[in-house]
Amino acid sequence: MALDRSTDSPGGFQVRHRSLGIFQGSSIGLAFWHPSSHMPEYGLCRFATRAKAQDYVDFLSSPACSEPLSRADLVIEDFDHAEHERLTTEYPQASAWETPL
């Protein structure tokens, strides 16, 4: 997962799961959700359009997804810029240079 600089753009949408939280992104084929991921430093995933968010909801609830979710548990919302900013400010990502061996 990497921070998406497009989160600075106005507008946008996010996907929320009823019990897992707000979609943060995916890595190695796994979806990450705040707060259940326990990785607030990644902030929230911003979809530029409602259609792109809907495409991802469709994928997450399809047989093509390795662990499909119930479509009833997923909702598309306006992107919460304030919450994204709070998470990435209060929980900055550690630099690889700062990671002890």
Spell out what each predicted region is:
Residues S6-G43, L69-R71, I76:
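Short aromatic-glycine-(Arg/Gly/Cys) micro-motifs in beta-strand/loop hairpins
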